[in-house]
A protein has these predicted regions:
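Iron-sulfur cluster-binding electron-transfer modules in prokaryotic oxidoreductases
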Residues: 1-212
Length: 212
């Protein structure tokens, strides 16, 4: 208790490589912005796996844990870590599944994606960034199909495409989009959704990635 932000992120960010780098990055952003934040051991999974199997009741149970954790901790806002399934469920279903979230500060959007939050800090010049530190890398961005086709960001059409790219461009000098017919709404499945992430389906996942 006592934190302003509850960060809810995919569980892989706590134990898997390279996902843990995401959690480290979130912590750096919060620290530099001077934000009091916390995570919950009760609601420690942002990815709502019930969407894999189409169970609305289980989706509700998982989302309810996040609602309850935010209320018990007395935070002002909830911020979601990067995860296509997590963001789709939060953006499209939270309010009707377990809302209202009227105990949160109405001054902040709910839910809020970590990219939205970081982009806002960058635009307000609250983060010190050194783009040249990443000059050895050439970066691109894969649009999550769940985010691209079923959500938005920033309260505007196309925000789910513009905001993540704006964050990347703010921290590097060498960003290049992939072919137009493979990005935005035309994105390919990354092989992480719908249960395809399981080891048993590795061969199928690789076949799906080959058109890239």
């Amino acid at each position: 208790q006592g934190a302003d932000v509850l960060l809810v992120t995919p569980s892989a960010d706590f134990f898997a490589e390279p996902h843990v780098d995401c959690l480290i990055g979130y912590a750096k952003v919060f620290h530099q912005a001077g934000i009091k934040w916390t995570v919950s051991s009760y609601a420690s999974e942002a990815a709502n796996f019930a969407m894999f199997i189409g169970s609305q009741e289980q989706m509700r149970e998982v989302a309810q844990r996040i609602w309850q954790a935010a209320r018990d901790l007395g935070v002002k806002r909830i911020i979601l870590g990067e995860c296509g399934h997590a963001w789709r469920v939060a953006y499209s279903f939270w309010d009707t599944l377990v809302g209202p979230f009227d105990f949160l500060d109405p001054a902040y959007p709910m839910p809020m994606h970590i990219c939205e939050y970081t982009d806002d800090l960058i635009n307000r010049e609250k983060l010190r960034l050194n783009k040249a530190a990443n000059d050895e890398m050439t970066l691109t961005f894969h649009d999550s199909c769940n985010v691209a086709r079923a959500t938005s960001m920033g309260g505007r059409p196309g925000g789910q495409f513009e905001i993540p790219r704006a964050v990347i461009k703010a921290v590097c000098n060498n960003f290049h989009d992939m072919a137009d017919d493979t990005i935005h709404e035309a994105t390919f499945c990354c092989g992480g959704g719908g249960g395809l992430l399981t080891d048993d389906l590795t061969e199928l996942r690789v076949k799906g990635a080959k058109p890239r």
